[in-house]
């Protein structure tokens, strides 16, 4: 099990990323627009830099939904490899069967 503080910190980052997503996308579009004047682009990049650091989606870490483990996760299931194996062997994941050839 991961520390509760690190899991909660990640949840806070997810909330902030969702909250600021529209504003961040709008500013990024202006900053990357070649048609806009250099002053507008520079102003947009300054406003983008003023946004909270944790509002960037890249700061969110993929964690296991069950244990909070940060490494060895499968995006499709949002589970770490350990819990995926455990739940699959119990038959809890629909359509997943043990491979044999």
Swiss-Prot record:
Signal peptide: none annotated. GO terms for molecular function: rRNA binding; structural constituent of ribosome. Keywords: Ribonucleoprotein, Ribosomal protein, RNA-binding, rRNA-binding. The keyword rRNA-binding applies. It holds the Pfam family Ribosomal_S14. InterPro entries: Ribosomal_uS14, Ribosomal_uS14_bac/plastid, Ribosomal_uS14_CS. Disulfide bonds: none annotated. One of its GO terms (cellular component) is small ribosomal subunit. It comes from the Bacteria. One of its GO terms (biological process) is translation. Gene3D superfamilies: 1.10.287.1480. Belongs to the universal ribosomal protein uS14 family. PANTHER family: 30S RIBOSOMAL PROTEIN S14, SMALL RIBOSOMAL SUBUNIT PROTEIN US14M. Part of the 30S ribosomal subunit. Contacts proteins S3 and S10. HAMAP family: Ribosomal_uS14_1. Binds 16S rRNA, required for the assembly of 30S particles and may also be responsible for determining the conformation of the 16S rRNA at the A site. This is Small ribosomal subunit protein uS14. It comes from Paramagnetospirillum magneticum (strain ATCC 700264 / AMB-1) (Magnetospirillum magneticum).
């Amino acid at each position: 099990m991961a520390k509760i503080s690190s899991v909660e910190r990640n949840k806070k980052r997810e909330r902030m990323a969702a909250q600021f997503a529209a504003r961040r996308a709008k500013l990024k579009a202006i900053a990357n627009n070649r048609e806009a004047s250099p002053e507008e682009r520079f102003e947009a990049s300054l406003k983008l830099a003023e946004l909270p650091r944790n509002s960037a989606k890249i700061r969110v870490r993929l964690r296991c939904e069950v244990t909070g483990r940060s490494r060895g996760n499968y995006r499709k299931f949002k589970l770490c490899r350990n819990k995926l194996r455990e739940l699959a062997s119990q038959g809890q994941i629909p359509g997943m069967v043990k491979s044999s050839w």
